[in-house]
């Protein structure tokens, strides 16, 4: 599991592995759903921006918590001691920075999918 890898090798290993995979991705893929920590790598985000539109599904923290809980059981590529609130506050400005398009994450999954299909 991601949490086991993080415990054994550290969260920076997870982030580096994520960056390596992104940079090895060919630019002919239509949709790439990255891990949440991909946004920490300027190199990865610049690469993705070079051939695609980056879509940020802006979802309020309380709704994220409803969907995934507090994150303790979920593997998070973040330093120990950071909770989902800390991660959200740290990542949200980065998602905004890199987004070409921002969608409302409060909408239904069906509405979001329809919007994305219309965009691509």
Regions found by a protein language model. Give the residues of each.
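Short, flexible helix/strand-to-coil boundary loops that buttress conserved ligand/catalytic motifs
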Residues: 6, 18, 26, 67-68, ...
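Short glycine-rich anion-binding loops that position phosphate/pyrophosphate groups of nucleotides
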Residues: 35-39, 60-62, 108
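Short, well-ordered alpha-helix to beta-strand connector turns
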Residues: 28-29, 51-52, 98-99
């Amino acid at each position: 599991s991601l949490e086991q890898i993080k415990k054994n090798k550290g969260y920076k290993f997870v982030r580096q592995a994520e960056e390596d995979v992104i940079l090895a991705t060919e630019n002919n893929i239509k949709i790439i759903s990255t891990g949440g920590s991909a946004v920490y790598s300027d190199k990865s985000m610049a690469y993705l921006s070079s051939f695609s539109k980056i879509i940020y599904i802006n979802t309020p923290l309380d709704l994220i918590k409803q969907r995934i809980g507090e994150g303790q059981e979920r593997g998070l590529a973040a330093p120990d001691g950071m909770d989902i609130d800390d991660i959200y506050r740290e990542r949200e400005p980065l998602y905004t920075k890199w987004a070409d398009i921002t969608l409302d994450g409060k909408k239904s999954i069906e509405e979001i999918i329809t919007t994305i299909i219309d965009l691509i």
